[in-house]
Every structure is written in C-alpha cells, then in structure tokens.
C-alpha cells in the first residue's frame, strides 16, 4: 500500500465513471483511500485492477464474471480480494509479476511483455522502487501504475533505491502526455501540500491544487490524472527542473549530483514532511 503517503480520509464518493474511447472506466473506493479500477468493453466484459477488497467488486459485477484481474504488486490492499473473487469465478485469469508473495497469480508477466486480453492490449512495464517486483500496465490510453506514481506524488520506497525509483518514474513520465493515470490511492490533496512546499512558484501546480480542493470538497475523486499534468506539477517527475533541484539542495544543505540524488532527497523530505 502507500502506507500513509498523503492525507488519509474516508472515501465517501460514489464510484467514478468516465469514458476512455468507447470504454467506461470506473474506480471503486475501498478501505480508507484505495481505488480499485474496472475497465469495461462495449460487450460488458470487465477488467479488474488491484482488487484489495472483493466486496465492492462483487457488488459492481453482479453475476458477470471478470474477464481478467491485473495485479501491480504484492501488498495486501491490492491483492486481498483476489481469493474471494476466484472463489466466485475460479476460471478468472490473474496477471501478476513474478513474486512468490502473489500466490494467486495464474499468469506471470515480465517487463516489455505485450498482453492481449479480450479486445484490450497492454504493455507490462517493470517499475521497481515501491516494491522490487512492482509492474505497471500501459495501454488503451491508460496507465495502471499501482503505488509507483500518484497524482502530485509517488509511493514510498519499501524495497527499492532512489535511483531505481527515479528511473521507474522517469520511464512512466516518458509515456504519451494524454495517458490517463489510474493510481491506486486518493492521496492528491496531501501530496499537493508537499508539492507546493517544493515549488511554490509553479502556476500549473497552483491551478491543479485549486481543482483538487474543489473535487475533494465535493467528495469526488481526483483521478484519473494525465501524464502531461503530472509532468507539469508533480515534483517527483521534475527532478531536472532548476526550481525543484534548488529546493532539494536547500533542504539537503549541499549540492546534489544528479536527478536520482534530487529524487532521493525529495522522497526523504516527503517521508518526514508535516504541513
């Protein structure tokens, strides 16, 4: 999980339904701040991403079995509902990275692999950092990135190093700007406070923060975001920007050698940050 990386608040909103092309995309609130993502095709077939809790998924699907389940990493708030879903629909394929801590997987995926699931096509991207085996799924104009990238933030490093995590984020940032980013937690408001501490003079960030406050006040999700928006606002994707580097160096108290060092300083700063 994100382990408290952002403001935690009970999610009260109804599931979000948006459209990407001809496909409805739905986020189901779970626990305090998780999102489980559903993608439906025009035949009503559904892809389920990171079902940490089976209950909202069972309620959303009714009697229709999922076409497949995609898992990004092994944390319980992402895989905890898989067993109950398989008990209901035992033939459901479960795609997951190579990691013994995901025993429910029926199909292991590797970096660069291209998946054809129904009419959908996704590429598997290895993005170590939050965990060593974390993957993301990119395709259909969408990015299911688990706990690697959040809106205005990123996941904590439980098993990776700053160079690994920074490289993973840079890899995601290089995808097309109109890619819709489907993060697994509603952390945006808390992340915004830190982002503004790092880069208070960023006008795109000010605009995004105002939008986020309106959405959360209305009980609405702040996701999906886009990669273009994150590149303009998210300090963890802006380690080469002079203002972000300067803020990190001021916090560290010394010059930083490269983007990975800037990232590591930002992540450590965020870990101990109090508004």
Question: What does each of the following model-derived ranges do?
Answer:
Residues 15-64, 120, 135-152:
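Conserved beta-strand hairpin/beta-sheet module of binuclear metal-dependent hydrolase folds
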Residues 80-81, 85, 136-137, 154, ...:
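Active-site-flanking alpha-helical
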């Amino acid at each position: 999980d994100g382990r408290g990386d952002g403001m935690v608040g009970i999610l009260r909103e109804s599931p979000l339904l948006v459209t990407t092309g001809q496909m409805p995309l739905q986020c189901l609130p779970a626990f305090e701040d998780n999102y489980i993502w559903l993608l439906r095709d025009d035949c009503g077939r559904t892809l389920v991403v990171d079902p940490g809790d089976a209950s909202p998924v069972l309620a959303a699907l009714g009697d229709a079995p999922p076409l497949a389940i995609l898992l990004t990493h092994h944390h319980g708030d992402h895989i905890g509902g898989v067993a109950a879903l398989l008990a209901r629909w035992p033939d459901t394929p479960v795609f997951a990275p190579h990691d013994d801590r995901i025993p429910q997987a029926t199909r292991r995926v590797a970096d660069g692999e291209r998946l054809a699931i129904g009419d959908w096509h996704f590429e598997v991207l290895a993005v170590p950092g939050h965990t060593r085996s974390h993957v993301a799924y990119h395709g259909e104009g969408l990015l299911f990135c688990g706990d690697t990238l959040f809106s205005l933030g990123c996941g904590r490093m439980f098993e990776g190093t700053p160079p690994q995590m920074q490289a993973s984020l840079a890899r995601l940032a290089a995808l097309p700007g109109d890619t819709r980013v489907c993060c697994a937690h509603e952390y945006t408001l808390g992340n915004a406070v830190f982002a503004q501490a790092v880069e208070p003079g960023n006008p795109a960030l000010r605009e995004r923060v105002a939008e986020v406050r309106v959405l959360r006040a209305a009980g609405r999700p702040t996701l999906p975001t886009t990669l273009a928006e994150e590149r303009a606002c998210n300090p963890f994707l802006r380690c080469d920007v002079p203002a972000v580097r300067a803020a990190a160096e001021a916090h560290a108290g010394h010059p930083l050698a490269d983007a990975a060092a800037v990232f590591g300083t930002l992540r450590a700063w965020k870990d101990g940050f109090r508004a």
